[in-house]
Regions:
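Radical SAM/AdoMet-radical enzyme domain recognition
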Residues: 3-26, 35-161
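Short acidic donor-binding/metal-coordinating loop in glycosyltransferase active sites
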Residues: 29-30
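Charge-dense, low-complexity intrinsically disordered segments
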Residues: 33, 100-104, 168-175
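A C-terminal junction/extension of Radical SAM enzymes
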Residues: 165-186
């Protein structure tokens, strides 16, 4: 997305929001950090006009963490109300579903960054979001692994995929999934 399209989206949101004061903008999909200059430009633009329109913007960003560095973490901590960190759990699970462009896994690269970011936010206003698939129906182990890494805010959700995909969840998987949720509730 270009900065101009982003500005038009902010203008549309302000106009369509009527008398609502609090507005939320979430940066996600693809990888927002690949277009970080545009993210910053949109935040700056929204901040520059929010008082004029009696609005209060809250921003959230979702990232796979590959491009996170200290400068970006500092910006996120100052400008993003919430941050969603994509991690699917155990190393072998995450690396299977989230390989880097060259095919190598991302786990070893992102986990220390995610831990640093979560700690810099005092373990609040973030969450680690995992996706479970047919490949890791034992996802309660992934939740426990993420907790063992020190994360306090954890969410896992089922994959949404074409049923023909080998990682898609099927109706036959549901009893196992229900059991995993029961195990987490204990």
């Amino acid at each position: 997305m270009s900065l101009e399209v982003g500005k038009k989206a902010i203008d549309f949101l302000i106009k369509a929001s009527g008398k609502r004061k609090n507005l939320e903008v979430d940066f996600f999909g693809g990888e927002p950090l690949m277009n970080f200059g545009v993210v910053k430009g949109i935040v700056e633009y929204a901040r520059s006009i929010e008082k004029e329109h009696n609005k209060n913007f809250r921003f959230t960003i979702t990232t796979n963490g590959i491009l996170l560095n200290d400068e970006i973490m500092d910006y996120i901590n100052k400008n993003m109300h919430n941050v969603v960190l994509s991690l699917d759990g155990r190393k072998e699970v995450n690396d299977r579903m989230r390989p880097r462009a060259g095919g190598q896994g991302s786990y070893d690269n992102i986990v220390p960054k995610f831990q640093k970011l979560a700690d810099s936010r005092n373990q609040t206003d973030y969450y680690v979001r995992g996706t479970f698939t047919h490949y890791n129906l034992d996802f309660a182990k992934d939740v426990m692994h993420m907790a063992d890494l020190g994360f306090k805010q954890i969410s896992v959700e089922p994959v949404v995929a074409d049923p023909a995909e080998p990682y898609a969840i099927s109706e036959e998987d549901l009893p196992v999934i229900f059991k995993e949720y029961e195990d987490l509730a204990v």
